[in-house]
Amino acid sequence: MRILIVEDEKRLAGTLQDLLRRQGYTADVCYDGISGLDNARSDIYDLLVLDAMLPGMDGFALLRQLRGGGSRLPVLMLTARSELNDRVRGLDAGADYYLTKPFEPEELLACIRSCLLYTSPSPRDRTRSR
């Protein structure tokens, strides 16, 4: 399974990438919203782990554009924005899960497993359905 992490905090992005790789996932990182959107549109990923506050384009705008283009890529928002209105905004934009920082690695991994099991077909199936 291939996961795209869009996170501007390089230290956290590296920690997430290491955690996911130790679990057997392939994990790539983008550090800004614009490159994150470009990569998420590539149809090679099984899951997007997305921060809300990013340079270039915030995670909410990225998600609206991704969903507006018809993408069904599963999205887990992972952000420090913990207010109710932020969570609602993320879910309304199309996030499948919304997890706040700080987080426990076990909870993050459980959300990822759930996203991968219950949300959307694999990239190959998404491509075939077009």
Locations of regions flagged by a protein language model:
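N-terminal/domain-start alpha-helical segments
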Residues: 1-117
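Conserved small/polar residues in nucleotide/adenosyl-binding loops
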Residues: 118-127
